[in-house]
Regions:
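Short beta-strand-loop-alpha-helix junction that forms the active-site gateway
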Residues: 44, 50-65
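Short beta-strand scaffold segments in enzyme catalytic cores
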Residues: 37-39, 88
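Short, flexible, glycine/charge-rich loop motifs used to bind or transfer phosphoryl groups or to couple energy/partner
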Residues: 28-29, 77
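Solvent-exposed, charged helical/coil patches
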Residues: 1-14
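Domain-level recognition of nuclease-like catalytic cores that cleave nucleotide substrates
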Residues: 80-133
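Short acidic/glycine-enriched loop/turn segments that link adjacent beta-strands
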Residues: 32-35
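Active-site beta-strand-loop-beta-strand hairpin of nuclease catalytic cores
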Residues: 14-27, 39-50
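Short, charged, amphipathic alpha-helix that recurs within catalytic cores of restriction-modification
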Residues: 60-82, 87
Length: 133
């Protein structure tokens, strides 16, 4: 799992207004067994998001999959159905954000409202190739 330094804590703090724009938020308790950082509840779907500092915000999706491999594995244990989504939010030291939906087999770039970006393809981390869900 990636470390939780001061930059990661700043990313969580800065994520709160973004999350509040999407609905009510509930922060997860800290600790070694924490799976996600916050939940967003409004209409379906409920969002479980993990917020991370990104040393290379412009990295390709395959590079991000490799860098956040342990975090993605942790997020994939969350039970999923049509009523929830799992997201990874990353923030650069300059405040640039990128958002991703985590599926059982792929990472898909989304906007801050949770909508898939039309021009972006997904990346399957089970096969290591573009595509997936």
């Amino acid at each position: 799992m990636t470390g939780r330094g001061s930059r990661a804590h700043r990313a969580i703090r800065d994520a709160i207004p973004i999350a509040k724009a999407r609905g009510l938020i509930q922060m997860a308790m800290g600790g070694p067994e924490r799976i996600n950082d916050l939940s967003i509840v409004s209409k379906i779907p409920i969002v479980f998001a993990s917020i991370m500092f990104a040393p290379k915000i412009l990295a390709s999706i395959p590079e991000l999959v490799e860098y956040y491999r342990k975090d993605l594995a942790r997020l994939r244990v969350i039970a999923r159905d049509a009523a929830n989504t799992i997201e990874l939010w990353i923030r650069s030291r300059h405040g640039t954000w990128r958002f991703f939906q985590v599926t059982p087999s792929s990472l898909v770039e989304i906007d801050r409202d949770g909508n898939r970006l039309v021009s972006v393809r997904s990346f399957s981390y089970t096969t290591g190739a573009p595509g997936g869900e």
